[in-house]
Design a protein with these regions (language model features):
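Conserved N-terminal beta1-alpha1 strand-loop-helix module at the mouth
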Residues: 1-82, 137, 141-144
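Structural preference for beta-strand elements that scaffold enzyme active sites
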Residues: 6, 35, 54-58, 87-89, ...
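Short beta->alpha linker loops
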Residues: 16, 38-42, 125, 188-189, ...
Length: 215
C-alpha cells in the first residue's frame, strides 16, 4: 500500500514558523506525498515552493471553530484560491447543525463550493463534538451542498480523539453512493493507525506525522 499517496502532510499549528513550513514542504517532496495542508497565510509560499511538483496545496477555511459568517468563509476561500490553493477544507458550523439549521449548513457549503471554482471541497464535521446521528446528518447535508469530501476533525478540540474508525466507517457508508470521499484527520500518528483509517474507508489522511508513517 502506497501510504504516501493518501497523505496530506499537515502543518496548522498557530505558532508555525517559516522554518517549520519549509521542513514540511521538503518532507512532502522527499516522500512524494499527495498534498500538504497549511494555513491560508502560507498558501502562496507553499505553492511557489512546490511549483515543479504535482503535490497539492490544501488550505483550511473558517478554521478551527467554523463560527465565522458564511460571507467571511466565502471571501477566505476566494482569497485562498487566488493565492494558489488546489483544495479547500472548510469547517462546518457545529452550533447551527445542533440547532437544526440545516438549510444554513447546506447553503454555506454550496456557496463555498462555488467559490472553489472547480476545486475539491472537503467539509470538516468535527466528529468529537457530534453524536452518531449528527455525524450521519452532517454527511447528508454535505451531499446536498455539493461537497466532494467529508472530513473528521480539525485536531483542535480540547481532549478530543480526532479520527475514529467507527466514525470513518459511518461517514463512508453514508456518502459513498453519492460519490463523496472521506478524509480522516486528527490523531493519526503511525502506520498502524493510517492503515486502519484507510481500511475503514478513508481516501485521504490528514496528519503531521507523514514522514514517520512512511519511514
Amino acid at each position: 500500500m502506497a501510504l504516501n499517496k493518501y497523505i496530506e502532510h499537515t502543518l496548522l499549528k498557530q505558532d508555525a514558523t517559516r522554518e517549520d513550513l519549509e521542513k514540511l514542504l521538503k518532507e512532502a517532496c522527499e516522500y512524494s506525498f499527495l498534498g500538504v495542508c497549511v494555513n491560508p497565510c502560507n498558501v502562496k509560499f507553499a505553492k511557489q515552493f512546490l511549483k515543479d511538483t504535482d503535490i497539492k496545496v490544501v488550505t483550511v477555511i473558517g478554521f478551527p471553530l467554523g463560527q465565522a459568517t458564511c460571507e467571511s468563509k466565502v471571501l477566505e476561500t476566494i482569497d485562498s484560491v487566488k493565492n494558489g490553493a488546489d483544495e479547500i477544507d472548510m469547517v462546518i458550523n457545529s452550533g447551527k447543525l445542533k440547532d437544526g439549521e440545516y438549510d444554513y449548513i447546506v447553503d454555506e457549503i454550496s456557496k463555498i463550493k462555488t467559490a472553489c471554482q472547480g476545486r475539491n471541497l472537503k467539509v470538516i464535521l468535527e466528529t468529537d463534538l457530534l453524536t452518531k446521528d449528527e455525524i450521519k446528518k452532517a454527511c447528508e447535508l454535505c451531499i446536498q451542498g455539493g461537497a466532494d469530501f467529508v472530513k473528521t476533525s480539525t485536531g483542535f478540540v480540547k481532549n478530543g480523539v480526532g479520527a475514529k474508525e467507527e466514525d470513518v466507517k459511518l461517514m463512508y457508508e453514508t456518502v459513498k453512493d453519492a460519490g463523496l470521499k472521506v478524509k480522516a484527520s486528527g490523531g493519526i500518528r503511525d502506520k498502524e493507525a493510517a492503515i486502519k483509517m484507510i481500511e475503514a474507508g478513508a481516501l485521504r489522511l490528514g496528519t503531521s506525522s507523514g514522514a514517520k508513517i512512511c519511514s
